[in-house]
């Protein structure tokens, strides 16, 4: 991804900004003036009272949120009905910091029932039932808060979500909740209620927005480092739950994957655009370390070529992470011979003044690598056209090759630039690039507002290796796993499919020139190893994703919403797959840690050309 943080509006916005949101208004018959919370919630995702005024809705205050854009309080009816599909809690949206109300107050609330869609209706998100424009009366104070309902491996179903209603474009909104059958229905049946998890293992590290992810099913698609692997579109991992806090940000734990929130973590169950169902904790369990350590890969032998890909997340000269990135490259990656860097920004970072050169950015990293005890890398890259390659505005992110000249040489040929396509020619009977470095098919519409592939020709021990550095378009705009549309739409795939076809076509051109050419296509593919994007890259056996040489439980380079998943890949031509004695390592140094310097883990491939 170009930047995870760039998709966030501000810290602790929770259910999000009203101007970016929408409400769903339904037409329904008149109801009696006095209703209970479970009547408002109903047995589907949409309230039968949406758009109506309700009067004197009774409940006990279970939580008060006085920060962010979604301020208000939760109430819960202490006298539940017998229907497991109807929640007994609801959020009362005040818009400003609630005054005159505290946890334990018995209140009556009058206002308008609303279905608020975090992120707006175009996001495809589910809605959150709220009472808006409230007038409330405190009847008494100091009451016992309704006991928190346990969310556990026993209560959360194995199946993730029902199939959406075809007549409603795949929406689940109108379907009667089946909380004993589907995980999303189970969570919806608890929306707004006081819930708890016990001894929950962390599967998504604490982030700058004081959020983390836990699982109530620690065995579910588990990996050896404590995470939960997303290994197919049907492996959504139902035990995942986001945790936020009603306390001070300074009191939020700095948790890594594999840690445990020992004891009870409890609070109201919310829904927001940055993770769906979220336990907004008034009580957080004690942090117990799982002892997670950063990995280091082995050094390549003298006869092995080590090639790596590393997304350094919007690196520009003003960043304070150069020494840490250098240390990772030297000590955790064992100084690979060739490194494809993604998200190298221009010399003035996000300042949008027409600068496109990145020599200062790359030079600072090379100097830091030397200071860390590594080799003095040489480098190659092509400056993009200003503002044409996506990413953070003004940053002009691009891919860059680092290479160790004591181990490999770079073949410079032609005068490649941002708009000139490199091609395939034959030199001394072998496949070669017409421009090295050069860009692959840069005029192809597949690369609109996205990074164009960078191709380079290297020589190791007399053998030519062609390397293509990629950074495919991001997943921005895809519907979330917890969306109202099931299965969710992945609209961003369309562009990546075109990009994959373009790279695959180029590799086929190489192989038609030299059948046994050594080709490596690597980078931030922004898609899974089981995705159609990857299958298109691999079409007709031109390439093979080497991450699939790892056990399924070890295939991940990124952690998103508690799912450990593959985004970064190294793909190889048949000569390397079958004859290169390849060794692959996803080196976990970032994605699982709260103090990460990038949101991606680097990948290393060793082989014998």
Which residues make up each language-model segment?
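Short, functionally important structural connectors and interaction interfaces within domains
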Residues: 4, 16-18, 32, 253, ...
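Secretory targeting and sorting signals
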Residues: 1-32
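Extended non-catalytic accessory segments flanking core domains
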Residues: 33-338, 419-423, 429-452, 496, ...
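Generic, ordered loop/turn and secondary-structure boundary motif
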Residues: 27, 38-41, 345, 559-561
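Divalent cation-coordinating acidic motifs and surrounding scaffolds
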Residues: 278-609
């Amino acid at each position: 991804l170009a930047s995870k943080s760039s998709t966030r509006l501000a810290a602790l916005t929770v259910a999000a900004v009203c101007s970016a949101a929408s409400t769903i208004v339904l037409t329904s018959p008149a109801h009696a003036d006095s209703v209970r919370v479970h009547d408002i919630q109903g047995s589907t995702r949409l309230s039968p009272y949406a758009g109506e005024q309700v009067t004197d809705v009774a409940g006990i205050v279970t939580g008060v949120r006085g920060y962010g854009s979604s301020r208000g309080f939760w109430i819960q009816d202490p006298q539940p009905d017998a229907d497991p599909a109807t929640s007994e809690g609801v959020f009362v949206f005040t818009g400003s910091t609630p005054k005159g109300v505290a946890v334990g107050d018995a209140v009556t609330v009058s206002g308008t029932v609303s279905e608020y869609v975090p992120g707006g209706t175009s996001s495809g998100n589910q809605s959150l039932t709220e009472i808006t424009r409230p007038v409330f009366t405190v009847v008494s104070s100091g009451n016992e808060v309704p006991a928190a309902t346990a969310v556990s491996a026993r209560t959360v179903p194995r199946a993730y979500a029902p199939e959406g209603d075809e007549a409603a474009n795949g929406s689940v909104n109108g379907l009667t909740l089946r909380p004993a059958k589907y995980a999303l229905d189970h969570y919806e049946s608890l929306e707004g209620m006081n819930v708890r998890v016990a001894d929950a293992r962390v599967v998504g590290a604490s982030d700058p927005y004081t959020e983390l992810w836990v699982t109530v099913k620690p065995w579910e698609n588990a990996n050896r480092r404590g995470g939960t692997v997303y290994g197919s579109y049907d492996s959504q991992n139902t035990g995942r739950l986001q945790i936020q806090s009603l306390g001070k940000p300074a009191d939020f734990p700095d948790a890594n994957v594999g840690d445990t929130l020992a004891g009870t973590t409890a609070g109201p169950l919310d829904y927001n655009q940055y993770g769906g169902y979220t336990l907004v904790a008034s009580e957080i369990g004690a942090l117990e370390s799982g002892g997670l350590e950063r990995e280091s890969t082995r050094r390549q032998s003298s006869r092995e070529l080590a090639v790596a890909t590393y997304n350094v997340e919007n690196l520009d000269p003003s960043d304070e992470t150069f020494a840490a990135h250098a240390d990772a490259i030297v000590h955790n990656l064992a100084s690979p011979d060739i490194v494809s860097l993604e998200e190298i920004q221009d010399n003035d970072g996000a300042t949008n003044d027409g600068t496109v050169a990145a020599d200062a950015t790359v030079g600072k990293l090379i100097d830091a690598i030397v200071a860390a005890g590594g080799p003095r890398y040489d480098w190659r890259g092509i400056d993009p056209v200003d503002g044409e390659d996506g990413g953070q505005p003004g940053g002009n992110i691009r891919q860059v090759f680092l290479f160790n000249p004591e181990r490999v040489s770079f073949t410079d040929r032609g005068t490649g630039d941002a708009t000139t396509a490199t091609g395939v020619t034959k030199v001394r009977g072998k496949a070669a690039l017409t421009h090295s470095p050069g860009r692959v098919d840069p005029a192809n519409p597949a690369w609109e507002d996205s990074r164009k592939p960078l191709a380079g020709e290297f020589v190791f021990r007399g053998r030519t290796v062609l390397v293509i550095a990629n950074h495919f378009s991001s997943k921005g705009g895809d519907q979330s796993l917890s969306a109202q549309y099931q299965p969710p739409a992945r609209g961003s795939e369309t562009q990546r499919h075109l990009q994959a076809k373009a790279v695959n076509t180029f590799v086929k051109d190489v192989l038609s020139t030299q059948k046994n050419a050594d080709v490596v296509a690597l980078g931030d593919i922004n898609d899974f190893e089981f995705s159609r994007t990857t299958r298109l890259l691999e079409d007709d056996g031109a390439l093979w994703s080497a991450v699939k040489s790892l056990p399924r439980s070890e295939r991940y380079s990124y952690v998103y919403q508690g799912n450990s998943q593959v985004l970064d890949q190294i793909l190889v031509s048949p000569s390397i797959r079958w004859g290169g004695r390849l060794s692959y390592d996803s080196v976990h140094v970032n994605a699982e840690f709260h103090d990460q310097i990038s949101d991606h883990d680097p990948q290393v491939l060793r082989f014998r050309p």
